[in-house]
């Protein structure tokens, strides 16, 4: 006997129930970025996922990036993007545009998408409620010929040094869903642009989040045969970096996951944001859809 659509939906909901109970009143931080941010249909699916998490008793927090949009705005305004060691140099004029794009444009677009589901999202950045303080990032690069390290001056690129969870705890007790842009003040009064992955990791660590999800353009961590690795311990992740299985741009992503776990996150997942409803598939199904990294 063929299953009707209603029967299938009921069966799927019944299967999801244990996971809804597992994550009830738990904090899940989702770093939203990559291809999904530029696709309207994926954006709507993401917003509905976040709304359903909230309706299921989860405390979701969204942190977002916006590198391509920043680059596009700088180009539109005739400002050349400069890079040092593969990292964007952010001068005073650039950081003002970064804040405008991240906190004033992208942030509000995500808030609007979530609000269209009937939930209440609120747009924030690190400046709000003194939530996050940063300091100038100290990055070095090694010269391939001389093997000598030199310090990069990236301008107003920052690193998180302090997270005050007071505002986020207050919002967790409300009906609000925080959507946070990775811009924060320094004790020196400057405004800093912060890598969205590390910003999300710092937020999740300060909240001892049950899960931190990184939405990317890849399925997760792959083995040498190109197959998805479903779960890794921190020690196993270090070993895969050492033997070259984890390479290229996946190295800093995994290192950020490890840092978040050391900061207090119970588990970090790298998953494909190009898959519709990937957040729900990860949280409310038995095996998930990405790579889970645990202590």
From Swiss-Prot:
| Pathway annotation from the record | Amino-acid biosynthesis; L-arginine biosynthesis; N(2)-acetyl-L-ornithine from L-glutamate: step 2/4
Keywords per UniProt? Amino-acid biosynthesis, Arginine biosynthesis, ATP-binding, Cytoplasm, Kinase, Nucleotide-binding, Transferase
Task: Site (Transition state stabilizer): give the residues.
Answer: 31, 253
Q: What is its EC number?
A: 2.7.2.8
One of this protein's Pfam families, by short name? Answer: AA_kinase
Please identify the protein, giving its name as recorded: Acetylglutamate kinase
Q: Does the keyword Coiled coil apply?
A: no
Gene source species: Rhizobium johnstonii (strain DSM 114642 / LMG 32736 / 3841) (Rhizobium leguminosarum bv. viciae)
Top-level taxonomic group? Bacteria
Among InterPro entries, the record links this protein to:
AceGlu_kinase-like_sf, AcgluKinase_fam, ArgB, Asp/Glu/Uridylate_kinase, Glu/AcGlu_kinase, NAGK-C
| Location in the cell | Cytoplasm
Molecular function terms from GO: acetylglutamate kinase activity; ATP binding
For the biological process aspect of GO, one term held by this record is:
arginine biosynthetic process via ornithine
Gene, per the UniProt record: argB
| Entry GO CC | cytoplasm
Q: Which HAMAP family match?
A: ArgB
Similarity comment text for this entry: Belongs to the acetylglutamate kinase family. ArgB subfamily.
Give the lineage: Bacteria, Pseudomonadati, Pseudomonadota, Alphaproteobacteria, Hyphomicrobiales
Q: Where is this chain primarily localised?
A: cytoplasm
This molecule's function is given as: Catalyzes the ATP-dependent phosphorylation of N-acetyl-L-glutamate.
